[in-house]
Amino acid sequence: MNRKDEHVSLAKAFHSKQKNEFDTVRIVHNPLPEVSMSEIDLHTTVAGLTLDYPLYINAMTGGSEKTKKINHDLAMIAKETNLMIATGSVSAALKDSALSDSYTIMRDVYPEGKILANVGAGTSLARAKEAIELFQADALQLHLNAPQELVMPEGDRDFSNWKELIKEISEGISVPLIVKEVGFGMTRETIDELAELGVQTIDISGRSGTSFTQIENARRKKRELDYLVDWGQSTVTSLLEANEAQHQV
């Protein structure tokens, strides 16, 4: 089975309503709101892109015929709701152009939409530009996924040049850059480091959704790394970590 299809199959198998730390968060009530509902405007800006509301469809999949259908359907949803959307990692298409249409289908379906390309942090500037040009992406997501790579049987084991590559991409592309986590959360120290590299937009996606350590461990013959299934910080913890760095990014 294609690895991308395997990821989707396992994500479905492991999908469940997990406990979420947002359930423990209580919003402080304001007894004196002094606002009219007609004055409320949900428009916001992410990475210089204006959105109708603070919501978008994040990176999921691509790289096979089955995932092409998923991306087609996601793009249809994005078009009908006027949402920004990101492709899954386009690394498969950069290695094999025959797989490109599983990503470009999003632009075919949603030509006027805001669509983000997605590549890993170990990607060169030249490859990053290829990813952007593949379907004229409006911005580039650069994902950090070291835990996934370490658990993945065929994953990368060398992350020593990530910061160098991130800086090159930050300085060398003509569209906005978003550095994102893939469900392991973010720390204040990492946010500080990324800001020093010129990164202005950071997606702090934390634990409680799809677990790529769980998915990759299920692909291992012995499944011996199950203790890493819940690795990382939650999004709530990551938000607290990010709070002190708001002035930087």
Regions found by a protein language model. Name each.
Residues 1-47, 51:
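An N-cap/entry alpha-helix motif that binds or orients negatively charged groups
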Residues 41-43, 101, 124-128:
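Short alpha-helical segments and helix-capping/turn motifs at coil-helix boundaries
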Residues 45-92:
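Active-site cofactor/substrate anionic-group-binding motifs, chiefly glycine-
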Residues 66-67, 94-98, 186:
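Secondary-structure boundary/capping motif
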Residues 68-69, 97, 152-156:
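Short, solvent-exposed loop/turn segments at secondary-structure boundaries
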Residues 69-75, 99-102, 131:
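"Short basic amphipathic alpha-helical interaction patches in structured regions
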Residues 75-80, 111-116, 121-249:
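Alpha/beta enzyme core
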Residues 82-119:
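A gly/proline- and charged-residue-enriched helix-loop-helix capping module
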